[in-house]
Amino acid sequence: MRLLALSGLLCMLLLCFCIFSSEGRRHPAKSLKLRRCCHLSPRSKLTTWKGNHTRPCRLCRNKLPVKSWVVPGALPQI
């Protein structure tokens, strides 16, 4: 009888911990898509040893809009 009560109490405690630990958690961040940024200014034209023009390119990150923190199950504020 005592074991049954303790195991039920432990299950309730574990359930409450799982619910409250994920209450205000943000969603996992999505991976940022990288693309090449090439500058188009005329002074940035580099020449290789063969004489071909190249543009200095680097990897750029797309700026994602800032998302507000959403609490799951919360009612909208009016």
Swiss-Prot record:
It is found in: Secreted. Disulfide bonds join 37-60, 38-57. The keyword Transcription does not apply. Its main location: secreted. Keywords: Antibiotic, Antimicrobial, Chemotaxis, Cytokine, Disulfide bond, Secreted, Signal. GO terms for biological process: defense response to fungus; defense response to Gram-positive bacterium; G protein-coupled receptor signaling pathway; lymphocyte chemotaxis; mast cell degranulation; negative regulation of cell cycle G1/S phase transition; negative regulation of cell division; regulation of keratinocyte proliferation. GO terms for molecular function: chemokine activity; G protein-coupled receptor binding; receptor ligand activity. It holds the Pfam family GPR15L. Induction: Up-regulated by Imiquimod in the skin. Disruption phenotype: Gpr15lg deficient mice in an imiquimod-induced psoriasiform dermatitis model develop less intense itch phenotype than wild type 1 day after imiquimod treatment and afterward, and display less severe capillary leakage and less skin hyperplasia after 5-day imiquimod treatment. Highly abundant in the testis, colon, eye, and tongue. Detected in the epithelial layer of the colon, but not the small intestine. InterPro entries: GPR15L. GO terms for cellular component: extracellular space. Highly cationic protein that has multiple functions. Acts as a chemotactic factor that mediates lymphocytes recruitment to epithelia through binding and activation of the G-protein coupled receptor GPR15. May be a tumor suppressor; together with SUSD2 has a growth inhibitory effect on colon cancer cells which includes G1 cell cycle arrest. May regulate keratinocyte proliferation. In addition, through activation of Mas-related G protein-coupled receptors (MRGPRs) contributes to pruritogenesis by activating itch-selective sensory neurons and mast cells degranulation. Has antimicrobial activity against Gram-positive bacteria, including Staphylococcus aureus and Actinomyces spec., and Mycoplasma hominis and lentivirus. Interacts with SUSD2; the interaction is direct. This is Protein GPR15LG. It comes from Mus musculus.
